[in-house]
Curated annotation (Swiss-Prot):
Forms an asymmetric heterotetramer with ChpT (2:2). There are at least two modes of interaction between ChpT and CtrA, only one of which is competent to catalyze His-Asp phosphoryl transfer. Component of a regulatory phosphorelay system that controls B.abortus cell growth, division, and intracellular survival inside mammalian host cells. This signaling pathway is composed of CckA, ChpT, CtrA and CpdR. CtrA is a response regulator substrate of ChpT. When phosphorylated, directly regulates the expression of ccrM. Is also probably involved in the transcriptional regulation of rpoD, pleC, minC and ftsE genes. Is phosphorylated by ChpT-P, likely on Asp-51. This is Cell cycle response regulator CtrA.
Amino acid sequence: MRVLLIEDDSAIAQSIELMLKSESFNVYTTDLGEEGIDLGKLYDYDIILLDLNLPDMSGYEVLRTLRLSKVKTPILILSGMAGIEDKVRGLGFGADDYMTKPFHKDELIARIHAIVRRSKGHAQSVITTGDLVVNLDAKTVEVAGQRVHLTGKEYQMLELLSLRKGTTLTKEMFLNHLYGGMDEPELKIIDVFICKLRKKLDAVSGNQSYIETVWGRGYVLREPDAEMRESA
């Protein structure tokens, strides 16, 4: 999961980064509202975490500008201001949720997962595709009840495919999701990851086809062919 953190307090930012990275999130941090706006417009994040007290501009202004710019990325406000007026104002400007500092790591992670699931159209933490089950909270994968052990990158790719099931994802989208524009390898690495992911799924699924190649475009996750499932 790719997270943009806009927070000017370096100690708090570092603490939040550690919380998120311990859950294998990719975190990109800035302490300036203007830069946060630029990054939010330019890159595809799963969620933006926004502090309200920034040195160059108000967090409310960051929020308002992003929404006026048609940036639909879910935004979670993290603020030391606990007044009901602050919460109402933040939600009114287009925030998806509001958390008051200090907060517990488990609650932050749970809120992030819930917000991202809703934004992707998944109210539940489990996405099922045929016999394939991806648990977004536990970060586990099963096929017909059998656990499939994936590397971090393999899981991130399958999670993205599951969240956008039925949508063709380009190799550039995978690279951006996995590396966020930092030290990106060549595009062909995506083919390697997909090949390994398919082999692991095939080994426990009776060669049911979940990940389809869309030649010249990318890859898409689809429900396995009904006849193939019946004959398996």
